[in-house]
């Protein structure tokens, strides 16, 4: 399983701490983008965030928790991410938004909140590269893993052979909960990493998924 580290939970010295995370044996930097509308919290503005992220050597995985999707896609596509993920619940034109991202040469993810069933996104699975299962309510870090997320991952895993997407899980991931999502391809970790010794925490995650 690949590891994406979200730096949303870093409170101080973000650039310095991100440079430490950048040296870890991980696969992605997960970038949470919040507009204060789709979710109540709001992240820093694009110019500030891009100045922090420009030096990272890891691939970027952008998670848009926003309503004005195209506006944010235009901004964050300049960071050359591997994925830009939008929310099923936020988009008013899902296929249009998917194609808008694809036309920029970027892989597309579609995310579902804890109360949204997998059935809702089945019509779009053939068009996307990633499904992001939110295992907490989106908008803030440090929440506990929602157990029903395990069933969603299992359902998406059974469907996966018919499509070309990877499964990503975000929220409440630690060395115990990672055992519940072994069918996932990418796990997003935040406060579990940033609240401790980075390298030992990554190692414990890799042990946990075995």
Specify the residue positions occupied by each region the protein language model found.
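Catalytic cores of alpha/beta
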Residues: 14-21, 68-78, 116-127, 171-187
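Glycine-enriched alpha-helix->loop->beta-strand junction motifs that scaffold or abut catalytic
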Residues: 25-27, 55-57, 77-84, 100-109, ...
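Surface-exposed amphipathic alpha-helices with a cationic face
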Residues: 22, 50-54, 77, 96-105, ...
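Glycine-rich phosphate-binding active-site loops on the catalytic face of alpha/beta enzymes
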Residues: 84-92, 132-142, 184-202
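Hydrophobic faces of well-ordered beta-strands that scaffold small-molecule active sites
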Residues: 3-6, 29-31, 60-64, 82-86, ...
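C-terminal alpha-helical cap/extension of soluble enzyme domains
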Residues: 168-210
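Glycine/Thr-rich beta-alpha phosphate-binding loop at enzyme active sites
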Residues: 36-47, 114, 122-154, 158-161, ...
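N-terminal active-site wall of soluble small-molecule enzyme domains
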Residues: 30-100
């Amino acid at each position: 399983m690949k590891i994406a580290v979200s730096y949303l939970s870093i409170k101080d010295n973000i650039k310095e701490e991100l440079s430490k995370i950048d040296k870890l044996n991980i696969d992605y930097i997960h970038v949470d983008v919040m507009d204060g509308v789709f979710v109540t919290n709001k992240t820093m503005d694009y110019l500030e965030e891009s100045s922090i992220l420009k030096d990272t050597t890891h691939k970027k995985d952008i998670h848009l928790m926003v309503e004005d999707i195209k506006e944010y896609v235009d901004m964050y596509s300049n960071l050359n991410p591997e994925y830009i993920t939008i929310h099923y619940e936020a988009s008013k034109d899902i296929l249009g938004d998917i194609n808008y991202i694809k036309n920029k040469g970027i892989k597309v993810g579609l995310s579902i909140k804890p109360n949204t069933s997998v059935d809702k996104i089945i019509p779009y699975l053939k068009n996307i590269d990633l499904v992001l299962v939110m295992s907490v309510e989106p908008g803030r870090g440090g929440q506990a893993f929602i157990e029903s997320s395990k069933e969603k991952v299992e359902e998406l895993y059974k469907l996966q052979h018919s499509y070309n997407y990877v499964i990503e899980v975000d929220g409440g991931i630690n060395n115990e909960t990672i055992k519940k999502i072994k069918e996932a391809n990418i796990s997003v970790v935040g406060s579990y990493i940033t609240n401790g010794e980075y390298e030992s925490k990554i190692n414990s995650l890799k042990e946990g998924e075995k």
